[in-house]
Amino acid sequence: DDFRNEFDRLLIHMTEEQFAKLEQALAHLSHQVTELEKSKSKELKAQILREISIGLDFIDSAKGHFERELKRADLNLAEKFNFESALSTGAVLHKDLTALATKVKAIETK
């Protein structure tokens, strides 16, 4: 049981670190979109969409795992809160990345 709790704690910690990196990537991608609007580069558009796709895939994977974990009967209040918090953070990031992808796809390239 202690092993499982430690595993959950480490998993949440690692996911929070990845979400923080995704937030930084989102800011960087927003700057790249500004550059894309000026340059109309097909290569830059493809690169931005690839990076967004990787972020969305990570969030979707984490979401599936955390939703399964929340069904466990042995979770204490703190563990449940941590999983729900990670799901909420992931949902916000997913929404922002999806909106950015929509914006990028709408940009005409040369």
Curated annotation (Swiss-Prot):
UniProt keyword NAD, yes or no: no
Q: Which InterPro entries match?
A: Mite_allergen_group-5/21, Mite_allergen_group-5/21_sf
Carries keyword Cytoplasm?
Answer: no
What keywords sit in the KW lines? Answer: Allergen
Task: Tell me the domain of life.
Answer: Eukaryota
**Similarity section:** Belongs to the mite group 5 allergen family.
**Protein's name according to its UniProt entry:** Mite allergen Lep d 5
Organism of origin is Lepidoglyphus destructor (Storage mite)
